[in-house]
Amino acid sequence: MTTNVSPAQTGTTGTNLLDAANGLAVVRVTIGAMFVWVFFENLGKGLYSPGGYAGLINYYIKASHSPAAWKAVMGLAANHAAVAAPMQGMTELSLGVLLLIGLLTRPVAFVAFLFLGSLWMSELGTAWIWELLVPVLASLGLAVGRAGRKWGVDAWLSQRWPPAPWW
């Protein structure tokens, strides 16, 4: 009996590392596309205007089961919707584009994890619980893994500057 082990496999488990990298890249591109899609969907709904943003946040304050402290934070955002609305729009678009192209994937995925976690907390009780929890956890997986090293700009950057923790 012979065992064929290619250089791309680990020594003990036989797991193909290239397949794992491809899987992380698919998740990265999917989460990035989700952010870009949501940006354009919300733009079309007028949710990045001060009135649209404040209306949505006030709905979450009234309808969600978020803790009182989080509702106070949401109230602050609603009261400053002229600043918060465009910031949220640019955050969603920036996270999406950076994840799609695979640039600075690890820090961007961590910011996406925090951002999606805050949205999940804001919508708590108003939507299906897994609707945002799955992308939250997927973003955390991208931050821990090296999802940008496949099909992304980070793959090129990691060849030029291998010890950098950003890719």
Task: Go through each PLM region and give its residues.
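Extended, low-polarity transmembrane helix blocks
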Residues: 1-94, 101-167
